[in-house]
From Swiss-Prot:
Protein role: Antifungal and antibacterial activity against the Gram-positive bacteria B.megaterium and S.lutea.
PANTHER family, per the entry: NON-SPECIFIC LIPID-TRANSFER PROTEIN 2-RELATED
One Pfam family of this chain: Tryp_alpha_amyl
Name of the molecule in the record: Antimicrobial protein Ace-AMP1
UniProt keyword annotation of Disulfide bond present: yes
Residues of the signal peptide: 1-27
Subunit note: Monomer.
One example of a Gene Ontology biological process annotation: killing of cells of another organism
GO molecular function list: lipid binding
SUPFAM superfamilies linked: Bifunctional inhibitor/lipid-transfer protein/seed storage 2S albumin
Lineage, uppermost ranks: Eukaryota, Viridiplantae, Streptophyta, Embryophyta, Tracheophyta
Cysteines engaged in disulfide bonds, as pairs: 31-76, 41-54, 55-100, 74-116
């Protein structure tokens, strides 16, 4: 009987830890997916491709639907820009959400002076100190 109670308590504890940590674990592992999705947008931003494939790709970012995922996606985009310096002050890249008429990605799309750690689900645009 004691063994069953101990096993049940241990199982409950492990399940609780998994539930609590899952949003953070998921937000840490999204960069490969975000990078793959925005590849056509990088090509467009650098003047190497038309905008249509980028606009279609942005719809795949709908999985970024929690505060932690939006913040993580924002950090991924900062990484993309840091690896492609031609995008840093590039209005063509910054204006992709507007040009694609995509309001969903605007709050976490990269732009100068964005603070990824301050993004929430209801944010429109956040311009603060540069996060580079």
């Amino acid at each position: 009987m004691v063994r069953v109670v101990s096993l049940l308590a241990a199982s409950t504890f492990i399940l609780l830890i998994m539930i609590i940590s899952s949003p953070y674990a998921n937000s840490q592992n999204i960069c490969p997916r975000v990078n793959r999705i925005v590849t056509p947008c990088v090509a467009y931003g650098l003047g190497r491709a038309p905008i249509a494939p980028c606009c279609r790709a942005l719809n795949d970012l709908r999985f970024v639907n929690t505060r932690n995922l939006r913040r993580a996606a924002c950090r991924c985009l900062v990484g993309v820009v840091n690896r492609n310096p031609g995008l840093r002050r590039n209005p063509r890249f910054q204006n992709i959400p507007r040009d694609c008429r995509n309001t969903f990605v605007r709050p976490f799309w990269w732009r100068p002076r964005i603070q990824c750690g301050r993004i929430n689900l209801t944010d429109k645009l956040i311009y603060l100190d540069a996060e580079e």
